[in-house]
A protein has these predicted regions:
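Conserved catalytic core of the tyrosine transesterase superfamily
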Residues: 1-150
Length: 150
C-alpha cells in the first residue's frame, strides 16, 4: 500500500505521458491491470464523467467515475497520441498495452520516485481502496466501486 504522497510522487515520476495516464486511471478509478489495458477511447464519456469498463470480472460492464483532473489528463494523452481504438495501445497499435508493459511502467515510476517498497499496478488499486476507507467511505460502497464479490 502506498500513502497518498507516495502515489502522487509515483504518478509524477511516470516515464511517459501514456504511462502517467494509464497509472492514473489504475489509481483514480481503482481498476485492475487488465481493465486498464483493455480500455478503448470510446469507453470515455466526458459528458457523464464516466469510464466504461467492459467485461470486468464477472463478464459484465460497469461504469466508474472520472474526476475532472483525470479526464483532463486523458484528454492531454489523447491530444498527444491520438490513439484510435485502444486508449493505451501496445507497441503494435492494433493491440492494447500489455499487463507487462504496465508493470514495467509502475516499476520505473516507483524507482524514479525513490519508492523502495514493492509496487505493482495492483498496489495502486489497493491504495485507492485504502484511501477511500481512510476518508470514511463505507466498505460496501468501496466493494461496489471495485466490483468485488461480497
Amino acid at each position: 500500500m502506498l500513502s497518498k504522497e507516495e502515489v502522487a510522487r509515483l504518478l509524477e515520476a511516470a516515464p511517459s505521458l501514456k504511462s502517467k495516464a494509464a497509472l492514473s486511471v489504475a489509481y483514480g478509478a481503482g481498476l485492475r491491470v487488465s481493465e486498464v489495458a483493455n480500455l478503448k477511447v470510446s469507453d470515455i464519456d466526458s459528458q457523464r464523467m464516466t469510464l466504461r469498463v467492459e467485461q470486468g470480472k464477472g463478464q459484465r460492464d460497469r461504469y466508474v467515475m472520472l474526476s475532472p483532473q483525470l479526464l483532463e489528463l486523458l484528454r492531454d494523452w489523447w491530444r498527444a497520441a491520438r490513439p484510435q481504438a485502444w486508449l493505451f495501445p501496445g507497441q503494435n497499435p492494433v493491440n492494447p498495452m500489455t499487463a507487462r508493459q504496465l508493470c514495467r511502467a509502475v516499476h520505473a515510476a516507483a524507482q524514479a520516485a525513490g519508492i523502495a517498497k514493492r509496487v505493482s499496478p495492483h498496489t495502486l488499486r489497493h491504495s485507492f481502496a485504502t484511501h477511500l476507507l481512510e476518508q470514511g467511505v463505507d466498505i460496501r460502497v468501496i466493494q461496489v466501486l471495485l466490483e468485488m464479490a461480497t
